[in-house]
Each structure stands twice: as C-alpha cells, then as structure tokens.
Amino acid sequence: MPNITMGLKPDPVAPTNPTHHESNAAKEIRYRGVRKRPWGRYAAEIRDPVKKTRVWLGTFDTAQQAARAYDAAARDFRGVKAKTNFGVIVGSSPTQSSTVVDSPTAARFITPPHLELSLGGGGACRRKIPLVHPVYYYNMATYPKMTTCGVQSESETSSVVDFEGGAGKISPPLDLDLNLAPPAE
C-alpha cells in the first residue's frame, strides 16, 4: 500500500539551500491572529468565542501593531486567560515587577506602550455614524426686504447678488408632498 500523508501539499518550488529558507523564517516573526497581506500590510482578526464568528480588527502597517490589536481584543473576549502575543501587562503583578524588570529576558515580557488602535483602520465592533449637517431653509416671505442702506458700488468688477429675486415677484409656495403620488394631470 502506498504511503499517503494527509495535510499540506508540498511546495512545488522547494528551496535548494535549506539554510537560506530557515534564515528567512527566522527574520519574519509570526504573531497570533495576524496575517501578512501580499502588498505588505498586516491584517488582524480574532474569533469571537460566544458567536463563533471571526471579528475583523483592522489592517495595520506593522505586525506589532496588528498583534497589539489582537492582544487587546483577546483580553476583552477572554480576560486574564487570553493567549496573547506580548505576555502579561507590566504592573499587573506587583510581586514580579522588581524581578522581571531586572532580569535579562524582561524585554520579552514587557508590553509595548498602548497605541490608539481606532485610528489605524477601523474596528469591527464600531459602526461609523454619519454626520448630520444642518439644513437651513430661507423663506423670503417671512423676512423683511433687505436694504442697501445707501451703499452703492461704482466698480465694474464687483458682483451683485439679488436676494429678493426681483421686486414684488415672490411666487406662492407649492402645495407639494413628495411622500404622495404625483397629481393626475
């Protein structure tokens, strides 16, 4: 019987120099919940343990930013039991703070400073609320006619704006409701 293995298909273009391939893998650190896009940016996502769905955390310029976004979301979802990329937060355990900071491996466990991640690429749980711009209606019939107060311009380069639409030519408003069907002709 032939030897059949299940899993990933072998790479058709295997590197001829295995040490070269290993050095590339050593340079590229892989973080939990982070994928590298083909164009070089990093995408972060996490699985919601309650809804069993993927939650999009955003696209980031560096893998570390994406990993921090994943860590923050993991702590929100799973609390202190969360598996994170950067270890425990400094100051969360006062008994270890003196020994961890003084140890030579402290850099591995110190969490980088908090970044404002909402500016980087949007969050999955936040919805953009459209801005409402005020709309001003200017009803000419309710305001007194504007006067120039004796100011006149002799310049040919100045422009004149007629707010009154002509003297005494105010048309009555249309009795029109756009929620109704158009009137029969």
Swiss-Prot record:
UniProt organism field: Arabidopsis thaliana (Mouse-ear cress)
Q: What is this protein called?
A: Ethylene-responsive transcription factor 8
Region Disordered: start-end pairs:
1-26
Quote the PROSITE patterns the UniProt record gives: AP2_ERF
- What UniProt keywords are attached to this protein's entry? DNA-binding, Ethylene signaling pathway, Nucleus, Repressor, Transcription, Transcription regulation
Report the domain of life of the source organism.
Eukaryota
Residue ranges of the motif EAR-like (transcriptional repression): 176-182
| GO cellular component terms listed in the entry, alphabetical order | nucleus
Record note on domains = Contains a slightly degenerated ERF-associated amphiphilic repression (EAR) motif, which may be involved in the activity of transcriptional repression.
Q: Name the DNA-binding segment ranges.
A: 30-87
Which terms under GO biological process does the entry name?
Answer: ethylene-activated signaling pathway
A single Gene Ontology MF term assigned here is: DNA-binding transcription factor activity
Q: InterPro entries recorded for this chain?
A: AP2/ERF_dom, AP2/ERF_dom_sf, DNA-bd_dom_sf
Q: Note whether Cytoplasm occurs among the keywords.
A: no
Q: Which lineage do the record's taxonomy fields give for this organism?
A: Eukaryota, Viridiplantae, Streptophyta, Embryophyta, Tracheophyta
What function is annotated for this protein? Involved in the regulation of gene expression by stress factors and by components of stress signal transduction pathways. Transcription factor that binds to the GCC-box pathogenesis-related promoter element. Acts as a transcriptional inhibitor and may regulate other AtERFs.
Q: For this UniProt entry, what is the primary localization, expressed as one broad class?
A: nucleus
Q: Does the keyword DNA-binding apply?
A: yes
Q: Where in the cell is it found?
A: Nucleus
